[in-house]
Amino acid sequence: MEAKKEKKYMSDIHLEDYTEQYETGFATVDTMIFEGGRREELLNGGWHYAVDQYDTCLRQKWYKERYRDEKGFTVPIDYSFDEWPVMQLPCSWNTIDPMYLLYEGSMVFTRKFSYIAEREETVFLKVGAANYLCRVFLNGKYVGMHRGGSTPAFWNITEYLKAENRIVLAVDGTRRPEQVPTENTDWFNYCGVYRDIALIRVPKCHIKTFKIALVPDGTFGHVIAKATLSEKITAKAELVIEELGVSRKIQLENGAGEVVFDAKPELWTPEKPKLYDVKVTCGTDTVSDRVGFREIRVNGRDILLNGEPVF
């Protein structure tokens, strides 16, 4: 019988497919929530960080904070989270220190935070933007990843939360042929977590998406509003635009619905960018936004804004 081979501590350095286990939990447009008007608990500020050129955090699973092996013996480690230097996030690391100016590889960021549950709730982690790949770990577990440096990412982290928490972000700014910027381009590649990091608390059943716009019929006198919930239930939402004297109910069936109503808002233009405060409430959840109403059409070679040529 062949003896079981012991895993060598440094064997992970030869792995070529080490990222496959982290190719799940993608943050996409379907995992986003409407964030306008919601209270955000910012995690901005000082984060411990380390350059991780060889993705050792992913290979050796630093995020698990395993300091002893299965037999209880202390193992050599390449990290000590709380002894790392501190970087103020959000930022692009290329602008923080001259020695990182041209660095486009991986960095690991970590910090601790406390959490007190206020009610039966769902908690999302928002990373406003991280260029280019961002993998999230919370309390020793892999949460998910996001590709794309210019869009926000949201993950439902409710099941991972404890009273005291350790969060780790593994950010990879490496250029690749399928990314923007690509490998060879006249475009500086700003890397890092360069927009807000925050927790967003919402009711278990919450407003997931909301849209409002002019009906594109050329009259500029009809408005359509659409909303969806996180659960496929029957409910009613209330839409309010105080300045226009508008208060309408949106009937939601299977968690989605819309309403069309008459209104004559002042139209948005570059010269006079009028905005209206819009609020939507469903149950205990409320979202809000500032909205400009305008219509864009194409007529032959002309681009029309509110019925008038732009050029």
Question: What is each of the regions a protein language model found here?
Answer:
Residues M1-F311:
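Secreted/periplasmic carbohydrate-active enzymes, especially glycoside hydrolases
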